[in-house]
Amino acid sequence: MKKGLIVLVAVIFLLAGCGANGASGDHKQLKEIRIGIQQSLSPLLIAKEKGWFEDAFEKEGIKVKWVEFQSGPPQFEGLAADKLDFSQVGNSPVIAGQAAGIDFKEIGLSQDGLKANGILVNQNSGIQDVKGLKGKKIAVAKGSSGFDFLYKALDQVGLSANDVTIIQLQPDEAASAFENGSVDAWSIWEPYLSLETMKHGAKILVNGESTDLYSPGFTLVRTKFSEEHPDEVVRFLKVFNKAVVWQKEHLDEAADLYSDIKDLDKKVVENVLKNTEPLNEIISDDIVKAQQETADFQFRTKAIDKKIDVKDVVDNTFIKKALEEHSSGGDQ
């Protein structure tokens, strides 16, 4: 009888365990998703404004919380502290986050970044090329895609960070410093590139296109979240895809919407959209190769303290499923 009781207890625990595991993956057990969003003009902002994420998730009993950031690196603090589930960031924060051991996955390519990053100088600065930055003060957000772009652009002409004075500033602070002449140059991304050139007379010294330097952007998810709620990761990507498609099909309306939300001149917005085509795609081998080259460069220049294999954080499973479901006729 004692043996039978032991077997019965074991079976009960086994069944309880199965039930618990099933519940952990059930979206009905999920109460809230936290989405990080930057100041960029991204379809993520369109979806936020139109309430598409709320429509898709709240009908399943899941609340949507938006968390605003100025750049990518602080978002990794949120991921590491379990205060963020999804985010979209540039290439450099992804590499720094992986090198720091933060647990996340890249689940989609959100832009190629060819024209999205550049180095600004004032029109009358006298600086004609990247070599002219030697000895100058340059504003940049540490660990951002602009940070990586600056280091690579300097390296291309035989300079390093030791040849310039790096002033680490987040975009809002950097804009003031650049406009009042406290710094000589600013390594930054859109929409700031268009805003400064069109409204304040700045000029783009170089960008990704002129230097052939890619700065791709990625959609990220916290690894534990993706393991426990895979269906919700697919749902997120499908909603984002809806916003990407809508922007491409309603470009003028999208420009009006961004202009209203950000209080920007529509012509500035149109220029930003011309330079930053949104994507929601599988992370290709070419992008992985470019990321690995960036990671190796950052290790060589001591921006990160260990070598990493960037493939370790790539997971195309969710985007493949999301795109398949979208093509079969279901946006959400």
Swiss-Prot record:
Positions of S-diacylglycerol cysteine lipidation: 18
Induction notes from the record: Repressed by sulfate and cysteine.
Main location: membrane
Keyword Cell membrane: yes
Keyword Lipoprotein appears in the UniProt entry: yes
GO molecular function, one term: ATPase-coupled transmembrane transporter activity
Covalent lipid sites (N-palmitoyl cysteine): 18
InterPro entries the record matches: ABC_SsuA_sub-bd, Solute-binding_3/MltF_N, SsuA/THI5
Membrane topology: Lipid-anchor
Localization per Swiss-Prot or TrEMBL: Cell membrane
Keywords: Cell membrane, Lipoprotein, Membrane, Palmitate, Signal, Transport
Signal peptide from the UniProt entry: 1-17
Origin: domain of life: Bacteria
Cellular component per GO, a single term: plasma membrane
Classification via CDD domains: PBP2_NrtA_SsuA_CpmA_like (cd01008)
Xref: PANTHER family: ALIPHATIC SULFONATES-BINDING PROTEIN-RELATED
Function (record text): Part of a binding-protein-dependent transport system for aliphatic sulfonates. Putative binding protein.
Family membership: Belongs to the bacterial solute-binding protein SsuA/TauA family.
Protein name listed in UniProt: Putative aliphatic sulfonates-binding protein
